[in-house]
């Protein structure tokens, strides 16, 4: 018997709800009350904040226990309640997959590059204005070769940008190598738990925990797509490894060629998606949103968000696929481990891949996911703009 049910009522659940049920209810209620969906409601932010606070308490076992026993006055987070919008993005921004895929920050590197070019463009414009002022002060007595000066300036700027991009790329590669090592270690731990479960005849318990984790991962941003990506990479790498052992390495020639062909296809798909989105964005930039009614504006913004999501997902997927392949290679090609053990690890990967590939969404969940991912994108863009302004 709980002292009060206000937080449970806000999320529309019973006091005996499981952690997964609480998270699902929070996502649904957060989408229903999100201020972006209620621009004309002055109380929208307060309602959204209330949903966030209810979840912050009920998702924390310690705070939930205090709330159930003593009520909400005794169940306040030590650091206070977080801002609902930032909390919403943090909870569903992909962190749940961290042990499987590492860093999943949409467009992080692209944003950094864009900021760098934007900053240097501003500096270049300011320098040009200063030069023009100097020229006018000389009363036209000293003339510069403007075209040559501009050309030299652009060459210099391009060199600086190239150096910074090379620096960013070097850092990205170092981060990637570190992530691959960490992810390989974590995947090895999961594989070991599977192998122990098989040997001890306790596979049912391992499967139950994995199924529960899959249910939670489905709630993440691009959750189902990430599960399918993991399944495809694990299955491909594991099957290729097992086949190479059966054919004494001869099949590696064919599987390697096939993998390279897939990589080329992925790169082509990424380029096509980017070009298609760019054309759509250019057309949309000609639209005057002030002339649209509320319904048309909502439809326009939804289309824009959808195009942006498509490009962001394509870029992230391409990068993730390469990272996951490196993780699998690190485990399966570790010569310090006997071949027989590595084959067993490959079979464990196939088991996990099968479970991930079996994940499904109902039509209602699919529509929820679409709306939800657009909201996540909106919050990430707001956060990015806020930090840009702060600088």
Curated annotation (Swiss-Prot):
Compositionally biased intervals (Basic and acidic residues): 129-161
Gene3D superfamilies documented for this protein: DnaJ domain
Record bears the keyword Hydrolase: no
Domain of life from the UniProt record: Eukaryota
Record SMART domains: DnaJ
Molecular functions per Gene Ontology: phosphatidylinositol phosphate binding
GO biological process: protein folding; protein import into peroxisome matrix
InterPro entries recorded: DnaJ_domain, DnaJ_domain_CS, DnaJ_X, J_dom_sf, Peroxisomal_DnaJ
Gene Ontology CC annotation, any one: nucleus
Chain intervals for the UniProt region annotation (Disordered): 119-161
Keyword vocabulary terms for this entry: Chaperone, Isopeptide bond, Ubl conjugation
Cross-link (Glycyl lysine isopeptide (Lys-Gly) (interchain with G-Cter in ubiquitin)): 132
UniProt keyword annotation of DNA damage present: no
J domain sequence ranges: 4-73
The protein's name: Protein CAJ1
Organism from which the protein derives: Saccharomyces cerevisiae (strain ATCC 204508 / S288c) (Baker's yeast)
Gene name of the record: CAJ1
């Amino acid at each position: 018997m709980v002292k009060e049910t206000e937080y449970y009522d806000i999320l529309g659940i019973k006091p005996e709800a499981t952690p997964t049920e609480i998270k699902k209810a929070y996502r649904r209620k957060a989408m229903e009350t999100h201020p972006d969906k209620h621009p004309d409601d002055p109380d929208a932010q307060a309602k959204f904040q209330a949903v966030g606070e209810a979840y912050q308490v009920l998702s924390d076992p310690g705070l939930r226990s205090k709330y159930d026993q003593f009520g909400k006055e005794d169940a306040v987070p030590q650091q206070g309640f977080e801002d609902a919008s930032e909390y919403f993005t943090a909870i569903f921004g992909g962190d749940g997959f961290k042990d499987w895929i590492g860093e999943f920050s949409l467009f992080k590197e692209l944003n950094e590059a864009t900021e760098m070019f934007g900053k240097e463009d501003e500096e270049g414009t300011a320098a040009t204005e200063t030069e023009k002022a100097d020229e006018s002060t000389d009363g036209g007595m000293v003339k510069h070769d403007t075209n040559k000066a501009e050309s030299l300036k652009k060459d210099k700027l391009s060199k600086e940008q190239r150096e910074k991009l090379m620096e960013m790329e070097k850092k990205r590669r170092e981060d990637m190598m570190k992530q691959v090592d960490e992810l390989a270690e974590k995947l090895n731990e999961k594989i070991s738990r599977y192998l122990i479960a098989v040997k001890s005849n306790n596979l049912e318990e391992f499967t139950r925990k994995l199924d529960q984790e899959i249910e939670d991962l489905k709630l993440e941003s691009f959750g189902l797509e990430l599960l399918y990506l993991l399944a495809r990479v694990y299955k491909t790498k594991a099957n290729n490894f097992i086949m190479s052992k059966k054919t004494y390495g001869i099949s590696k020639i064919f599987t390697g060629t096939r993998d390279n062909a897939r990589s080329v296809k992925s790169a082509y798909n990424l380029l096509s998606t980017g070009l298609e989105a760019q054309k759509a964005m250019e057309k949309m930039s000609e639209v005057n949103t002030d002339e649209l009614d509320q319904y048309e504006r909502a439809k326009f913004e939804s289309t824009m968000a959808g195009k942006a999501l498509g490009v962001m997902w394509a870029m992230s997927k391409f990068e993730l696929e390469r990272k996951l392949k490196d993780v699998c290679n690190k485990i399966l090609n570790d010569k310090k481990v006997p071949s027989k053990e590595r084959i067993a690890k490959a079979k464990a990967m196939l088991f996990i891949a099968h479970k991930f590939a079996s994940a499904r969404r109902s039509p209602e969940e699919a529509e929820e996911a679409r709306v939800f991912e657009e909201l996540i994108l909106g919050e990430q863009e707001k956060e990015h703009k806020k930090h840009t302004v702060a600088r």
